[in-house]
């Protein structure tokens, strides 16, 4: 840790020492001293405004009010679109939000009492999944072969070296 901070401090010192050489004592061009005008001013202000405020609901609302004041005339109150009351009870949801896959699979989500449990994957589907979950090693290949061809394991394997994983 100490070596890294010394390295960072040395690098900063080197940059500060070489900075006057890079500037070569020349003043900045006149274009940098003039403030931007017209459309460039508003574009520059928008870029700066995006970095000054944190991205929250309040900051987005304030930014929208500054950028589009014509939309706020006579609006007042809540500007959210009215929700269609007929769609309120449709679908499988919790308070208007979609149920995540974990909640729908485990039955722990809202409104899941009437649904049958999902079917378990078939053997070929399970094997396709198994290929992606396990590294390709001797043990995983042996396990996969036992799952694919259980009829070959009836005799015990012959060598006596088989073991249950």
Swiss-Prot record:
Q: What is the native source organism of this protein? A: Naja atra
* The keyword Transcription is annotated on this UniProt entry: no
Gly residues: bias regions: 154-165
Query: Which protein, by its recorded name, is this?
Result: Natriuretic peptide Na-NP
* Keyword Iron-sulfur in record: no
Q: Which GO terms describe its cellular component?
A: extracellular region
Which GO BP terms apply?
cGMP biosynthetic process; receptor guanylyl cyclase signaling pathway; regulation of blood pressure; vasodilation; venom-mediated vasodilation in another organism
Region annotation (Disordered) ranges: 56-100, 135-165
Q: Keyword set for this entry?
A: Disulfide bond, Hypotensive agent, Secreted, Signal, Toxin, Vasoactive, Vasodilator
UniProt-listed InterPro entries: Natr_peptide, Natr_peptide_CS, Natriuretic_peptide_brain
Q: Which residues form the propeptide?
A: 26-83, 129-165
Q: Where is the composition biased (Basic and acidic residues)?
A: 56-68, 135-149
Which family does the UniProt entry place this protein in?
Belongs to the natriuretic peptide family.
Highest taxon of the source? Eukaryota
Q: List the disulfide bonds.
A: 94-110
Q: What is its main location?
A: secreted
């Amino acid at each position: 840790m100490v070596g890294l901070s010394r390295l960072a401090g040395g690098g900063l010192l080197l940059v500060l020492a070489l900075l006057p050489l890079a500037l070569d004592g020349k003043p900045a061009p006149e274009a940098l001293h003039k403030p931007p005008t017209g459309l460039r001013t508003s574009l520059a202000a928008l870029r700066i405004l995006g970095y000054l405020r944190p991205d929250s609901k309040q900051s987005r609302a304030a930014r929208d009010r500054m950028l589009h004041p014509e939309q706020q005339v006579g609006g007042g109150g809540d500007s959210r679109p009215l929700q269609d009351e007929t769609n309120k009870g449709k679908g499988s949801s919790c308070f208007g939000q979609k149920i995540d896959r974990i909640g729908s699979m485990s039955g722990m989500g809202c409104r899941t009492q009437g649904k049958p449990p999902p079917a378990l994957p078939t053997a070929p589907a399970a094997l396709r999944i198994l290929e992606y979950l396990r590294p390709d090693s001797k043990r995983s290949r042996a396990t996969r072969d036992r799952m694919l061809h259980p009829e070959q394991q009836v005799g015990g394997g012959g060598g006596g070296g088989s073991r249950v994983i």
